[in-house]
Amino acid sequence: MTPAPIPTEVLGALAGTRPAPRSTQALRAAIHARRMLLLKSLLVRTDRQRGLLGPVARRDFERAWALLAAAERTGPAEVREVLDYPTTGTWLAAALAAPQGAAFERQLAHLAGVAVAAAVRAGHTVTGTLTVPTGLLVLPGLGVLPCPSGRVRLGGGPGGTRIADDGGHAEAVLPHPAARPGPGASRATGDGTGWSALRTLPGGTVRLDDLDPYRTPPPGTGPGSLRAADRPDCPWGTWARRWRRARELLTAVDGRRAVETGAVLRAVVPLAAPDTGATPMGATLRSAPGAALIRLPGTASELAESLVHETHHTKLAALDELVPLCGPDGSAVHRVGWRPDPRPVPAVLQGAYAHLALTDLWWRVRSGAGADPAWRRRAGERFEALREEVGQALSLLLESDELTPAGREFVQGMERHHAGLGVTAQNVL
């Protein structure tokens, strides 16, 4: 599946960081096209290396693939939600990179959980048994079930889909789609002994994903190897309150931005507190757009800023699937104001884009009548410095020969929006 070329007006709207439904739709299409390409690549690799797979791994993969295809016929939109869930992307990247042998077979086994999640979401009846070699059945976007026996039994009934460890250690009943809570409900989906369900943050459909093993690639990501926090270290009440307040703050100063954040993000992944030293508050994985990896900020306004920042990392990662913005093999590195280490041009572009969105937000916060007073003071103190740093980064980008024609057009659009916030890009001598 190849997404349609991006219209010039959509590229221009994205460059300005301002929310637009048409832009969001184009980016979602790009994410799905990329996900389908990776899934097809996994199928092709598995088919070509059939003779190198063990008989159990090959059989289980074929069964899981058949279940996924059947679920797609029942509910294509619901299956798409599972395939486009951020951790599915992290898994696909890990599976395609795994060396042939036991490591690859372990990655292939995860397709069973993806297929079961798709069937549950689509309301497709699922029966039979599945092998779970890791001892943990992971249903992306839904939850996890421990399976010490290494096998699960599946069955349908009036209450929904029943999943049980073959040794009787754990079970879950996941309700049919019509029986699930709607958007904005914070209670978890499903019930049962040993079942741990993902929880939905208040006021929307974004999950607080503190369970999925693929929510960060091992051994972590980013400077200092940022680690995902496990559920015992993720206080649900604090996250829910801070999330609700952050959304209220965003809505008061920039309602469109609040809506966009809820539409682009699919999950928030809590990060563990660092052992020592300062580390970034958030991150976005290129393989998992739509997931904001965030260490719980001290205030709701800081969380609101992190959400806007990570939303724009997702937007740019998805846009780059539609139209490459930087050429290959660039070796030059540059200093930017928000990082202590030199960055290559693609990273400068990512940082400049996310910080331009943050500059736009602070511009509205400091002048908005509905802004929280403490947040208005913070925005006023930091706006000028960040505006200057973004301007310098835009100048570096425009002087670089590593941008593609579309990338140059995009950065010029960023510069125009930056100028509208009160300053033009600085000339670098």
Predicted regions and their residues:
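Short, flexible loop/turn elements at secondary-structure junctions
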Residues: 254, 272-274, 296-298, 312, ...
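Domain-exit/linker segments immediately C-terminal to small folded modules
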Residues: 352-357, 367-403
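Short, glycine/acidic-rich hinge or "gate" loops at secondary-structure transitions
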Residues: 259-263, 267, 324-329, 368-379
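Catalytic zinc-binding patch centered on the HExxH motif and its immediate surroundings
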Residues: 268-288
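Post-HEXXH active-site segment of zinc metalloproteases
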Residues: 284-287, 297-306, 314-346
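Type-3 copper protein
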Residues: 1-269, 295, 384-429
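Post-HExxH zinc-binding segment in Zn-dependent metallohydrolases
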Residues: 331-374
